[in-house]
Design a protein with these regions (language model features):
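Alpha-helix-loop-beta-strand connector modules within alpha/beta enzyme cores
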Residues: 56-80, 119-141, 162, 187-207
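Glycine-rich, proline-tolerant flexible connector loops at the mouths of alpha/beta enzymes
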Residues: 44-69, 103-116, 145-151, 176-186, ...
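Glycine-rich, positively charged N-terminal anion/phosphate-binding segment
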Residues: 28-76, 82-90, 95
Length: 248
């Protein structure tokens, strides 16, 4: 077996990915307790929520208040998910210094999630990158359905690589490949990991797996064998996508 990395970095995405699909709404106080407990447990990167339209994702309607009231622990990176310039400005107003923009490699999923094609979504990110640079906000990127889509089926790696090129042109240095619908398998993860690291050695890579088919941990191991050391995780294994059938 190929030697594994000595160190990995975990981002807790529970406050966002874990809660966005839940029918039971937590109070602001309960969400703050979850975030602050994760920080006390030693998690160094926490995604506190998404700055998106509350009508589309009601569970995230209080993200601005969460950010404003959060007791921030030194040495912990608190980030938020955004889709557009309005979301970025909300994140800025809430004191968030790192925001993640996301686009789906699947056309159908991107239309459901953002009401845009992947090409339109990436094009719209140019003004976000310009604004973020002016305001000294760090942008990271995430590519949903990188390993397949429950709507479109197979998502060619070429589509993913094309989006990576576009994000890199915007100056983004950290990119996550997300298995939004849990369709990835270990061989695919390893091959993708080796390929993208060779193509883009200057990018900080993150992997985000769902456990829809019980392959989550096996895919993490495959990612580690490919040399990728950054992973998203979610407390209690919660999580899913409101716009992707069967994602969990």
């Amino acid at each position: 077996m190929k030697s594994l990395p000595d160190f990995i970095k975990i981002c807790e995405v529970g406050p966002r990915d874990g809660l966005q699909n839940e029918k039971v709404f937590l109070t602001i106080e309960q969400k703050l307790e979850l975030i602050e407990t994760a920080a006390e447990a030693g998690i160094k990167v926490i995604e506190i929520g998404s700055f998106v339209n509350p009508k589309a994702v009601p569970q995230m309607a209080d993200t601005d208040q969460i950010a404003a009231r959060l007791h921030r622990k030194a040495g912990v990176e608190y980030r938020g998910l955004i889709f557009n310039l309005q979301g970025l400005k909300r994140a800025e107003a809430a004191g968030i210094s790192k925001a993640k923009i996301t686009v789906s490699a699947s056309r159908s999923h991107c239309l459901r999630n953002m009401n845009k094609t992947p090409e339109e979504a990436v094009k719209s990110f140019a003004e976000l990158a310009e604004y973020a640079e002016q305001k000294k906000i760090v942008l990271s990127g995430a590519i949903s359905t990188s390993f397949g889509c429950s709507i479109d089926g197979i998502v060619p790696l070429e589509q993913v690589v094309n989006i990576i090129f576009q994000l890199r042109k915007l100056g983004i240095q950290e990119i996550s490949l997300s298995d939004t619908t849990g369709m990835a398998n270990p061989l695919q993860v390893y091959e993708y990991g080796v390929h993208i690291k060779k193509l883009f050695p200057d990018i900080e890579w993150v992997l985000h797996f769902h456990n829809t088919r019980g392959m989550g941990l096996a895919n993490v191991l495959a990612g580690l064998m490919a040399g990728i050391t950054n992973y998203d995780a979610c407390f209690a294994g919660l999580g899913g996508c409101p716009f992707a059938p069967g994602a969990n």
